[in-house]
Amino acid sequence: MKRLLTIQDISCVGQCSTTVALPLISACGVECAVLPPALLSNHTAPGFTGWSFCDLTAELGKVEAKWVEQGIAFDAFYTGYVCESHIDPILSIFKTCAKPGAIRIVDPAMADNGVLYRGFAADFPSKMARLCRDADYLLPNLTEAALLTGLEPKLSGYSKGEVEDLIGKLHGLGVRNVVLTGVSFDDSLLGTAVSDGRTVAYDFNPREPRSSHGTGDVFASVFAGAILRGKSAAEAAALAADVVCAAI
């Protein structure tokens, strides 16, 4: 059984981040280890009026040291919601706790609907870009893709050419495979654009009439599990989208 380490916060309430990743990746038949760099009382999405935040940055190096001491290593890493102070420790863990050929899956969970999540400074996308560089799989939504590439996000109306231009810019960060979510050229359909740097494959599902927080984490978790079970990026993205639709 392959072993994956997911590095993202624990939100005690809100059906997101680590509390979503652990059961879904485990259900895929992959051992899921966790490293939460922060503990939040709840999700920061609209609908919650505030939250507590316990920063665990100081613990990350201690955990890493014990893993190195014991020879604990991982076949893959999957990062989600993290803060600026977490990025350097995560990059270090990528180097010291990786098995040969370890896969890096990065979900740059920081923005949606044209704006950064509450709590992130305006310059955070440039910090997140450091974590995204050289990722094997990058899973941004359209807003995150725009911010990572220094563009002004649009709320809607992306053309196929604009989508593929965004993808090209993301590959420019050294990303091997881009899985762009929230793609739509028809108001009734919503889907993904998956690129290996040579071709772009699109997959769409009927658009749900309501928005649900945590769906991006469900998508990324199932995607990560499917990749570790040998699925291609396009196959993993299609499966993850189907699971999200079924869950909603």
PLM-predicted stretches and their roles:
Residues 164, 169-248:
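Conserved phosphate-binding/catalytic region of the ribokinase-like
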Residues 118-201:
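Conserved phosphate/ATP/ADP-binding segment of small-molecule kinases
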Residues 7-10, 37, 80-82, 107-109, ...:
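Fold-independent oxyanion-binding glycine-rich loops
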Residues 1-106, 110-118:
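Conserved N-terminal subdomain of the carbohydrate kinase-like
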Residues 16-20, 55-62, 72, 85, ...:
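Conserved active-site and cofactor/substrate-binding residues in soluble primary-metabolism enzymes
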